[in-house]
Amino acid sequence: MIRVRGIFIGLALFPCVLLAGKILESSVIHDGAVYRLSITARLEAPLAVVYQSITDFSNLAAINPSIEESQVLESQGSGRQRVRSVVRVCILVFCKRVVQVQDVTLVNYRTVVATMVPGAGDFRAGLARWELTAVGTATDLHFTETFEPGFWVPPIIGPWLIEKKLVREVARTTLYIEGQAGE
């Protein structure tokens, strides 16, 4: 899943960033085969709307058009679900459909934790965490993820491209969530 804090370089390349919530920070660290992502964004939407949007696992495509499909595979008890999603990821002219299967835990009304299921998708391992904080009528979303892809990522430009893609996707997602808040 794509995780997240960041530097918005190339605003000219991603004009949707200016229309969406504000990206406060982002970073990507590459260590061997493992990536560590972090991003914080401020959404002009109430915490309850943001939480509902990011936990509607059967309808994630509604908040990000890069998500081609998402579904709950099974409920694993109170606040735990196994979720499968397919994301179309394009970097430059290369596109790939990435499958991820995660065991998702709704920790409380503002925290979600997802653990990749090894062998069930295109990742060897991964752990993601979403933390929401109300800031007046807005919400800060802090997303972190550590993952090891099961596919090749170019080592020299990979971290830079992943950060660019992450920032763009978070910006697109905030735009959709803010649109839902305005309805």
Regions found by a protein language model. Name each.
Residues 42, 71-120, 172-183:
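Glycine-rich portal/gate segments that line the openings of hydrophobic small-molecule binding cavities
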